[in-house]
C-alpha cells in the first residue's frame, strides 16, 4: 500500500540522513575492557534469546584506547547484533596491542559465513542481505573508524568463523 511505501521511504531517508551526519568523535582515554563488558551486557538479552554467548578476551593487558567511547560502543553492538542475526552461537571480542603499538580489536563469530559476493558489498551504504535491514550499520561503523584514523574490515569469513577487525593507529 501507499502508506507502507511511504514508511519505507521515510526509513530510507532517515537512514541516509544519519549516515551522512556522523558527529566528530569526542575522544578520551579509557580501558577497553570496561567498554567490552558494557557491550556484552547491552547485548545480553538478544544473545541469550538466540542461544548465543558473547565473551571478551584481553590478549594484551590493560588495553587503553583513546577514542569516542559511545561511537566505538555503537560499532561493537552492531557487530554483535549482526553475528546473532547470522545465527552465531559463540561471539568473541578480543583486544591486543601489536608490535607497531596499534590496538587491534577482533569480533569473531561462528555464524553463517558471508558469501563471497556479499563480502565485496557489505560496507556499501544501504546494501543488506537481511529482510529487515537498512544496510547502514557496517557503512556507518567504517565511517566512524575512519574519523578515528583507524579502519574496520572483514578479515575472514568461512565455514568456521567470521572475523571483523578494528584497527586503531
Residue ranges, per PLM feature:
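Conserved DHp (HisKA) dimerization/phosphotransfer helix of two-component histidine kinases, i.e.
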Residues: 1-22, 29-46
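Conserved micro-motifs of the catalytic ATP-binding
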Residues: 22-25, 64-67, 129
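Conserved catalytic submotifs in the C-terminal HATPase_c
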Residues: 53-63
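Short beta-strand/loop element within the Bergerat-fold HATPase_c
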Residues: 90-101
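Short conserved segment of the HATPase_c
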Residues: 114-126
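Short alpha-helical Gxxx[C/S/T] motif in the catalytic ATP-binding
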Residues: 137, 141
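Detector for a conserved hydrophobic position within an alpha-helical segment of the HATPase_c
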Residues: 145-146
